[in-house]
From Swiss-Prot:
An example Gene Ontology CC term for this record: cytoplasm
Enzyme class: oxidoreductase
Name under which the protein is recorded: NADPH-dependent 7-cyano-7-deazaguanine reductase
Taxonomic placement: Bacteria, Pseudomonadati, Pseudomonadota, Gammaproteobacteria, Enterobacterales
Positions contributing to substrate binding: 88-90, 229-230
Gene behind the chain: queF
Subunit description: Homodimer.
GO terms assigned for molecular function: preQ1 synthase activity
Length: 282
């Protein structure tokens, strides 16, 4: 269990509780979680973060009524800046989006502006929103993470409790390499409900070479770990930076969707440009 799982800041969340579904617009349904909850234990301070990045959300279940009452549907793309005070709690996001279902809006841009305003207010940070008509995305190919997959290793694993021990002495030699490693075996659990979160992760770095077996064991150790997606990515970035000391580092995870939403956080200290195309499990 994370050290802050019972923090007072989490007590008021609807997550893990029985809730009513509202279908008329209600911005108060959105709930934020302070990023400081996981950053403080990691020694990360808001005014001196070792990374940049965004939390990329895809909204697959977004619908509202136009001015004449005709239902509209869209796929939404949301980017929440890493400097925001709060992350957005996903169940509250789902409930909030449901409140659009029977609400009339004059046009698509009014919907986009409403989302942008409400999410920015909840997160206390910068948010950008784009809405796509379905025919704009039809035929879009399934994406993939560029890099070398480290999953197919003939090793025995018997520990699934989170530990950074595997990263001790995980680099070798003095030669500087630049490589991108990928794993589809990332699995963590919701901080509150402990429901499984499934993801793929891309780690791009420049520095002394990281032992792939040790890295895979470290990633698999998240299997019983309880934290939100964004918190896991920041923990992985921080641990790799601390133990492996790369000159450049980027960590990007794309998680499978739940409740019509997927969350795809990335953190980097270099010029990293994430691909936003959904992966095969998304």
């Amino acid at each position: 269990m994370s050290s802050y799982a019972n923090h007072q800041a989490l007590a008021g969340l609807t997550l893990g509780k029985s809730t009513d579904y509202r279908d008329t617009y209600d911005a108060s349904l959105l709930q934020g979680v302070p990023r400081s909850l996981n950053r403080d234990p990691l020694g990360l301070k808001a005014d001196n973060l070792p990374f940049q990045g965004t939390d990329i959300w895809t909204l697959y279940e977004l619908s509202w009524l136009n001015a004449k009452g005709l239902p509209q549907v869209a796929v939404g793309h949301v980017e929440l800046d890493y400097t925001s005070v709060n992350l957005i709690e996903s169940k509250s996001f789902k409930l909030y989006l449901n409140s659009f279902n029977q609400t009339r809006f004059n046009n698509w841009d009014e919907v986009r502006q409403t989302l942008e305003r409400d999410l920015s207010t909840c997160a206390q940070g910068e948010v950008s929103v784009a809405l796509y008509r379905l025919d704009e995305l039809e035929g879009q190919p399934i994406g993939h993470f560029n890099g070398t997959c480290i999953d197919d290793q003939d090793i025995t694993i018997d520990n699934y409790e989170f530990t950074t021990d595997y990263l001790e002495n995980a680099t070798s030699g003095e030669k500087v390499v630049e490589e991108t490693l990928v794993s589809h075996l990332l699995k963590s659990n919701c901080l509150i409900t402990h429901q499984p979160d499934w993801g793929s992760i891309q780690i791009q770095y420049r520095g002394r070479q990281i032992d792939r077996e040790k890295l895979l064991r470290y990633l698999v150790s998240f299997r019983h770990h309880n934290e939100f997606h964004e918190q896991c990515v920041e923990r992985i970035f921080n641990d790799l930076l601390r133990f492996c000391q790369p000159e450049k580092l980027s960590v990007y995870a794309r998680y499978t969707r739940r409740g019509g939403l997927d969350i795809n956080p990335w953190r980097s200290n270099s010029d990293f440009v994430p691909s936003t195309t959904r992966l095969v499990r998304q």
